[in-house]
């Protein structure tokens, strides 16, 4: 078996190859690689990329959250101790046991909605047994004794 004959004419002339490459560079067909970026800082900060907002096919939570504290849950019951009665008579103040999660604004709104009375201010404290007590001071145009009568404390 003799080795396969290589066609000598198929090999390109080096001079012709160089001329062809020079012509391509001049015409702009060959794109140069971008120059390497010179880093001057020691630390590398990852560049911010585009964050596309999520478009879920369905919500993660199927039921909408309901309000856990409505007005009836905020005010548990009025306090009818001797000291509470003294507050009603002397300071125009009603005393309630309220939900531990209720804040002063929620207590004020609950009293306004349930008893149709304006409150001047609300003071709260947490009792040693873990319940929250609210002192609801009424405005001068409301009498705490009449409101207590209407509620059924007295």
Curated annotation (Swiss-Prot):
Pfam families: Ribosomal_L23, Ribosomal_L23eN. One of its GO terms (molecular function) is mRNA binding. PROSITE patterns: RIBOSOMAL_L23 (PS00050). InterPro entries: Nucleotide-bd_a/b_plait_sf, Ribosomal_uL23, Ribosomal_uL23-like, Ribosomal_uL23/eL15/eS24_sf, Ribosomal_uL23_CS, Ribosomal_uL23_N. It comes from the Eukaryota. GO terms for biological process: response to cold; response to high light intensity; response to oxidative stress; translation. The keyword Ribonucleoprotein applies. Transmembrane segments: none annotated. Keywords: Ribonucleoprotein, Ribosomal protein, RNA-binding, rRNA-binding. One of its GO terms (cellular component) is cytosolic ribosome. Belongs to the universal ribosomal protein uL23 family. NCBIfam families: PRK14548.1, uL23_arch. Binds to a specific region on the 26S rRNA. This is Large ribosomal subunit protein uL23y. It comes from Arabidopsis thaliana. The lineage of its organism: Eukaryota, Viridiplantae, Streptophyta, Embryophyta, Tracheophyta. The gene is RPL23AB.
